[in-house]
Design a protein with these regions (language model features):
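Thiotemplate assembly-line natural product biosynthesis machinery
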Residues: 2-24, 79-82
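Phosphopantetheine carrier-protein modules
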Residues: 18-35, 55-65
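Phosphopantetheine-attachment site and its flanking helix in carrier
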Residues: 34-52
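C-terminal structural segments of small proteins and small subunits
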Residues: 57, 64-81
Length: 82
C-alpha cells in the first residue's frame, strides 16, 4: 500500500536531516537542496537513502529534476504509483 504524502514528507525530511545534518523542523516542501548547500554527492546520498527507505528505484531520468523536498516526494509518489 502506498503511503500518503504526509508520511512520505516525514520520511524525506528525516532522511534530509540525517544526510545533510540539518534541523528537520526547518524543512518544508518548498525547501530546495540548494538552500541546504547540498552538492552533487549529497544529492546522490539523499536519493540512495530514499530508495533504501522506500524500497524503490528512482529512474535516472528523474534524478536531475529532484531539487527540493517537494520534488523528492513527487518522484517517490510517481514510482509508487507505477
Amino acid at each position: 500500500m502506498a503511503m500518503d504524502r504526509s508520511e512520505i514528507f516525514g520520511k524525506v525530511v528525516d532522511i534530509a536531516s540525517d544526510v545533510l545534518g540539518v534541523d528537520a523542523g526547518e524543512l518544508t516542501e518548498e525547501t530546495t537542496f540548494d538552500d541546504l548547500d547540498a552538492d552533487s554527492l549529497d544529492r546522490l546520498q539523499l536519493v540512495t537513502a530514499m530508495e533504501d527507505e522506500f524500497d524503490l528505484e528512482i529512474p535516472d531520468e528523474k534524478l536531475e529534476s529532484i531539487n527540493s523536498v517537494a520534488d523528492a516526494i513527487e518522484a517517490i509518489e510517481s514510482v509508487q504509483e507505477a
